[in-house]
């Protein structure tokens, strides 16, 4: 069964710019760019050039990579920090554009750049204003916060093309599609990553997609179908980003992903990512909910989740 990090790379290979930016950002955060450059033959030199030029006067101290004692930096840490910040800002911009283009994702509350005020050093989140710990945003136009600069657009287009055309990545992702799925029934076990969508009362949460209503197993089957179409049809690759971080993704299992907050806001209350109802309900379950879930997937008796 796929996990959300599988889906992230599947989305990057499918040409989703937000997935590409996120995959690079995570690699830079943990100083693990070898997996991208050596593993998949994807050059990050365009990002190096961009970051050195655009962020030359910004120390990007908040974006210094995590120290890996087992693997010392083979690239200057300050350069990695500049690359890290550069791709993070691009990620936030392209994500907000996806949200704007897909109102059905119900993620308007995650369009944080719209309320960004570098001059005042603040950002508004869910009706509350917070101070920023970093106000250097050389590529953000106060009148059009989510607009990519021409250089950013060229950079993310170049990087996305190299991800989509990497033969090694294509080989790995096609293996994931061939052998993986949203869930699997195996030897009286129901296997899935993260959760099922449930309401607070334990009922299956219904999700409307293209005029039809899905829940439980039918929703997992629909997500599986859409994930395959996103890659093999070359259309709607952004759905794979939905599966990476949306509150209605069974692969994510949280109400929001607070990446922006963790970088730019010191108040740790904003860093919290509340879990979906599934987890609390399963902790309190006397076996009734588990039995109902197993029945939904055609399993019973001594079957396990």
Predicted regions: what is each one?
Residues 1-305:
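Feature recognizes metal-dependent phosphohydrolase scaffolds
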């Amino acid at each position: 069964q796929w996990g959300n990090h599988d889906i992230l790379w599947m989305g990057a290979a499918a040409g989703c710019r937000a997935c590409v930016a996120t995959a690079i950002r995570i690699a830079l955060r943990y100083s693990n760019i070898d997996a991208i450059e050596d593993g998949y033959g994807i050059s990050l030199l365009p990002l190096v050039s961009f970051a050195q030029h655009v962020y030359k006067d910004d120390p990007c101290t908040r974006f210094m990579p995590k120290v890996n004692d087992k693997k010392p930096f083979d690239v200057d840490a300050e350069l990695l920090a500049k690359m890290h910040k550069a791709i993070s800002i691009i990620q936030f911009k392209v994500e907000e554009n996806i949200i704007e283009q897909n109102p059905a994702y119900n993620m308007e509350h995650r369009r944080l750049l719209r309320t960004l005020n570098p001059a005042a050093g603040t950002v508004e989140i869910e009706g509350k204003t917070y101070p920023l710990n970093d106000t250097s945003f050389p590529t953000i136009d106060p009148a059009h916060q989510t607009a990519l600069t021409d250089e950013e657009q060229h950079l993310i287009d170049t990087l996305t093309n190299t991800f989509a055309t990497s033969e090694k990545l294509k080989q790995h992702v096609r293996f994931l599609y061939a052998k993986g799925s949203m869930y699997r029934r195996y030897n009286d076990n129901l296997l899935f990553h993260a959760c099922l969508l449930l309401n607070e009362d334990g009922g299956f949460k219904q999700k409307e997609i293209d005029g039809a209503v899905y829940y439980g197993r039918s929703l997992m089957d629909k997500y599986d179908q859409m994930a395959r179409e996103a890659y093999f049809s070359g259309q709607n690759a952004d759905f794979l980003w939905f599966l990476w971080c949306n509150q209605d993704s069974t692969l994510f299992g949280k109400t929001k992903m607070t990446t922006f907050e963790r970088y730019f806001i010191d108040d740790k209350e904003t860093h919290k990512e509340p879990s979906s109802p599934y987890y609390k309900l399963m902790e309190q379950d006397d076996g009734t909910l588990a039995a109902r879930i197993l029945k939904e997937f055609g399993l019973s008796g001594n079957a396990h989740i």
